[in-house]
């Protein structure tokens, strides 16, 4: 699946423009290990190391749609993993919003800061 196909799938499933727009601006492949990068836009969870996964895009879109998100909001994500959802949240809340993440796996925290 390509990025455009994933975006079309999210639109067809009725997700809001702000959610689809965030997915369009954040490249999922930037948050995936090289060995699974070719599958970055498949609608499936992918391993990111240390027994953790980057969540399925559909699952993330559902989660984002259930939150009261908008420009200028503050958000805390527990279990930030590779930082992909943090990047999506940052796009949605904009430059006047604040996004914070907490991750217990030190190696993932270091990797997400690099991305």
Model-identified regions with their sequence ranges:
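Class I SAM-dependent methyltransferase Rossmann-like catalytic core
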Residues: 47-53
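A short glycine/small-residue-enriched secondary-structure motif
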Residues: 37-44
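Conserved nucleotide-cofactor-binding alpha/beta core module
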Residues: 68-115
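Conserved alpha-helix/loop element of class I SAM-dependent methyltransferases that forms part
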Residues: 3-4, 43, 54-71
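N-terminal auxiliary segments of SAM/dcSAM-dependent transferases
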Residues: 1-35
């Amino acid at each position: 699946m390509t990025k455009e196909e994933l975006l079309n799938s999210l639109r067809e499933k009725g997700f809001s423009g702000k959610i689809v727009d965030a997915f369009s601006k954040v490249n999922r492949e930037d948050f995936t290990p090289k060995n699974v990068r070719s599958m970055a836009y498949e609608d499936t969870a992918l391993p990111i190391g240390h027994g953790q996964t980057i969540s399925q895009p559909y699952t993330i879109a559902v989660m984002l749609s259930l939150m009261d998100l908008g420009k200028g909001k503050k958000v805390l994500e527990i279990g930030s993993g590779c930082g992909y959802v943090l990047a999506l949240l940052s796009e949605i809340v904009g430059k006047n919003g604040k996004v914070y993440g907490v991750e217990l796996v030190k190696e993932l925290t270091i990797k997400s800061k690099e991305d």
